[in-house]
């Protein structure tokens, strides 16, 4: 009887299409790393997996299989099967995998088939698909010429990238804007999940037939998400285009990003009082994150201005007082740092211009 299995040659199609996948690994494995379109419905919970693994090391495969069957039986087995059936009722074309595409995949497939659901498992499982994605990242620079979008803080680089189909939004994947004030409301992904999502985005970009791979100018770390070494090296060697924007527009944009969006996000998640407190803490922690660069005296001045702006905002609903510390942050910290960094890239710069001019240049080149 032929094995109902999706071959490794299908990895690209599965990942690019966001094909639904049921991940039968234990929750601890799934939490460490998974794929964007996968959902965890385990064959074994964490403790069951640990016991079976210990048995395998001490007594061999058959003893481990027997223990697994004794642990997942009766009502427990039925509960797992019910969860799988609900998933495949919702996603009738989904696949399944375990870590290596081995015993767990085959047993899950067998139980589903006995319940009247015939589901293919993926050859090689998570491990082989993960390796495929690692190779995708390592080969990214050779697949499509990288082009780095630089620009002074507040110039709207992310908004610009999102308006184009030849870009990959690294900050969106990392859930962080890459600066001291760059934290999102939701937590950052694990390093493995960041890499997996990046690789899937690169595969989709390759399929778009874009002329180049447009990426925002980033440090090695975006928050706590580290760019893979080979990928970052490619970025450091790539040509650069520079987005320019007047100060007034930058201040308006940063007031919206640092104040309006963050404040409303915290309020939405935590309610009025707790949300405002969390927003105030976000600003305090962000400025403290650059205390060493600012120096103690200047840091204290920033904190005083921020506290005053928060008091005005809370009492009057007026956010305009925040402009003072944002403008100071640009002049004292971000702009000098940017100038130092862009000077080092001078020989790689191909074009400078505002949003409209940049779109026109990229479309023509």
UniProtKB/Swiss-Prot annotation:
Leading EC class: transferase
Q: Which UniProt keywords apply?
A: Selenium, Transferase
Positions annotated as active site in the UniProt record: 98 (s-selanylcysteine intermediate)
Q: Which GO terms describe its biological process?
A: tRNA wobble uridine modification
Looking up Gene3D superfamilies in the UniProt record yields:
Rhodanese-like domain
Which EC number applies? 2.9.1.3
The catalytic activity, as recorded, is: 5-methylaminomethyl-2-thiouridine(34) in tRNA + selenophosphate + (2E)-geranyl diphosphate + H2O + H(+) = 5-methylaminomethyl-2-selenouridine(34) in tRNA + (2E)-thiogeraniol + phosphate + diphosphate; 5-methylaminomethyl-2-thiouridine(34) in tRNA + (2E)-geranyl diphosphate = 5-methylaminomethyl-S-(2E)-geranyl-thiouridine(34) in tRNA + diphosphate; 5-methylaminomethyl-S-(2E)-geranyl-thiouridine(34) in tRNA + selenophosphate + H(+) = 5-methylaminomethyl-2-(Se-phospho)selenouridine(34) in tRNA + (2E)-thiogeraniol; 5-methylaminomethyl-2-(Se-phospho)selenouridine(34) in tRNA + H2O = 5-methylaminomethyl-2-selenouridine(34) in tRNA + phosphate
One Gene Ontology molecular-function label: transferase activity, transferring alkyl or aryl (other than methyl) groups
Q: Which domain of life is it from?
A: Bacteria
Q: Per the record's keyword annotation, is Kinase included, yes or no?
A: no
Domain Rhodanese positions: 15-138
Report the NCBIfam families cross-referenced here.
Answer: PRK11784.1-2, PRK11784.1-3, tRNA_sel_U_synt
Subunit structure of this entry? Monomer.
Name of this chain's protein: tRNA 2-selenouridine synthase
Origin organism of this chain? Shewanella piezotolerans (strain WP3 / JCM 13877)
